[in-house]
Amino acid sequence: MSPVVSERLLSFDNRIVNQEELNRIGINLDFDKLDLSLNLSLSRDDARQNQFSFDVPYEKPLYSEAGLFSWHNIFNLTTNYIDSELDTSQLDWRVEWISNGNIGGYQGLNLESSVYAVPDELNLDESMKIYRGDIRAFVDRPEYPLRFTIGDITPYSAGHLPSTTLGGISMERLWNRLQPTRNIKSGGSQDIYLVESATVGVYINGTFYGDIRLPPGRYSIDDLPLRQGDNDILLSIRYQSGRREEITYSQFFNTRLLKKGFSDYGIYAGVISEVVEREYSYDTDQTVGQLYYDYGLTDSLTIGLNGLYHNLGQIAGFSLGIGTGDSNIGFRGSILSYSESQESDSFGYIASIDFSTILWGNLNSSSANFRSSFESFYDYRSTPWQTEDDIESGNRGLVSYTYRLYNNVNLNTYVQVDTFQDPVRYDITGQLELEINYFGFDVTLGIEHQQNYDLVTSDETTYYAIIGWDWYSDDGNYEFLAQYFTRENVTRATFNKYSSNTVGSYGYQLNAERSDILQSYEARANYVGNRYSAEIDVSRFDDNEGVFTANSVSGRLSTGFTMVDSDISWNRGYRGPTAIVSVHDSLEVPVHINEFIGDSPEAIATSTLSNSVPLYSGHSSSSFDVSIPDAPIGYDYGSGYYQITPGTYTGHVVHVGSDEAKTVIGSLVDINGKPIGLRNGIVSGEGVTRSIFTNKAGRFAIDRMKSGTFKVTIIGKLQYTGILVIDDVDKNLIYLNPVALKEVLP
């Protein structure tokens, strides 16, 4: 409450205050006749304003004890049966083994690898083909922070540097991974690498464009169905092992602003690597060195340098980021050198300026509604050494503006102009959209004009509409989505029942899509078990002309295996740091992990077979709970709450239950039978030391005890000593006869 209200309350002193007096100072007190309760609330003007900031000071984490050796494994099995009129293999399958490990704790050696097996269709003498994915080893130094990596690496593409994949070494200052709780206003890499099979949901500018089922591999954002210019993209990735991830980015250049005094950099060196027919190829004739360095001169000004060396081409560039309140300006410039003989000059350049701000018509939204970008390039090729690509000169400019008429009505405009030299050509694209959102309905009405001047001149105007309805149940477990796209005359409907990450959870999805070309139907169901997850889907594709029909059935199974020193567990597949929950032999009932009211547990461990719980984020604190609903009466297994700060791939072991799980209740008396009340002391023996307290009647209760003989010492002005015996019985709640103590004479 505000200080004024506090002072008025104090002025009432100790007298009785009626409801009207409380209402006058902004305190509302209402009596609920249904449940006989009092509801107390403050008026808005009299409530104290609390300020919350995510810019909290960084505190160096206190890392938890980890195993010397940890090994995390995910095993995925995928089978597909296709019945079609095309001459293709009907039965297909794939086995995936994704492995991560750590030796030596959070500052030790981390390992990443993956191995896959598929039918060998080219070699009839062998039944399967085994190939690998990216393999790398790295060491973290989170206090700096720095990561040193050797193996298959993907450098961060700063400025105009191309996206490359190398076999080599790197040194990176990965703030967001090694110090994830520190706020430096830094962005992250936008590369996409799927280490295991996944279903990728594609959302572009808020519109769902469908799911793509992808096997493990490297994928470029250029492979997605994006339009030129402004694209706000969300990739919702659902891995086969059950892990989920979301990647969001914009096709506009994202200016990186660092806090004053903070730097971010990466240094990479190696040879070009390519994956051809699932085989890794390292071209030792193509050596690459790449680096970037960004530094925050002030909180609103960041400068950067970047460069790349290749024996057939080099790039040197700079970047400048300026933040001015609601606006951001980014400058990038690069000079390119080509070493091979060619008709054009041996040097080229590219310069870009990107601007975003909040303009009139943004209502109360804090996101930028005006974006513009201009780029000029001369004798430019994005990857200098790829001589098969053309060298181009020209300019590119685009402007995007959103006018928010109401909270649910937007007017979007977009214009892009591309001009090229030698030969002279240009492309102009203009777009105007009216977007209306109302009670789950999303209606977009648009007009697009495209004009191209090349060897063939074209001028086309298109009118289109996108109509959708998205419904969620109140509990968020069910969704129905219906969409219609006039451009391709596509109608799509999807009904989802989402599963949760708990034992026994299940989900399903029904999809139907129809267009002028084809129609497709799909039914998918998934189940989350205690130590595995499974998914099955059935689909059908029909060519509307009756030329092609295909039916397919797919099944996917995922499980995991974790080892930390000598402890092992069978669990669902988890990537990242993990804690094994090991149950003591004295517990013959299951232990539930992360069981919340009204939900099933996320996992169940038993004394015969341990289970694991993911810690999700390395170098920051993670917590989980264990509970034992069927625990024996009196069995003490502690608070059940565990908090662990892991490294990137460290493994941890939590022991639930022990021999010291008995609860003992009794009383202390002196040799005359008089209660020793309101006293404290120590109970020790059998390797156990516990505190003891008595009430006025001399009664006490001690938890976490074991069977055996113990010495009782009562301290204070009058000291007592004696022996307490706990018999070896199966019961965990034990009531003792009065324990007689002798007074210790001075």
Residue ranges of model-derived segments:
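Outer-membrane beta-barrel channel domains
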Residues: S2-G261, G317-T324, R332-D389, E522-P590, ...
